């Protein structure tokens, strides 16, 4: 249990550094691009899976 607390503390510190450091805007743009990219890949694989059945 203590191990998970330490892990979550480290994740929170890293998130705070990104959030308050100004890196968040760049990371958000990259996340948006990746989201749409993976959404397209998911839809293509879904359609191809339905066609092959």
Swiss-Prot record:
A GO CC annotation recorded here is: plasma membrane
The compartments listed are: Cell membrane
Which Pfam families does the entry mention?
DUF1328 (PF07043)
Q: Would the keyword Transmembrane helix be found if you checked this record's keyword annotation? A: yes
Q: Does the keyword Calcium apply?
A: no
**Keywords attached to this entry:** Cell membrane, Membrane, Transmembrane, Transmembrane helix
Q: How does it sit in the membrane?
A: Multi-pass membrane protein
- Residue ranges annotated as transmembrane are 6-26, 30-50
Question: Which family would the database say this protein is a member of?
Answer: Belongs to the UPF0391 family.
Q: HAMAP family recorded for this chain?
A: UPF0391
Q: What is this protein called?
A: UPF0391 membrane protein azo1750
Q: Which organism is it from?
A: Azoarcus sp. (strain BH72)
């Amino acid at each position: 249990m203590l191990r998970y607390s330490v892990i979550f503390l480290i994740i929170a510190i890293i998130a705070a550094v990104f959030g308050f450091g100004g890196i968040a805007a760049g990371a958000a743009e990259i996340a948006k691009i990746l989201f749409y990219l993976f959404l397209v890949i998911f839809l293509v694989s879904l359609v191809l899976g339905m066609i092959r059945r």
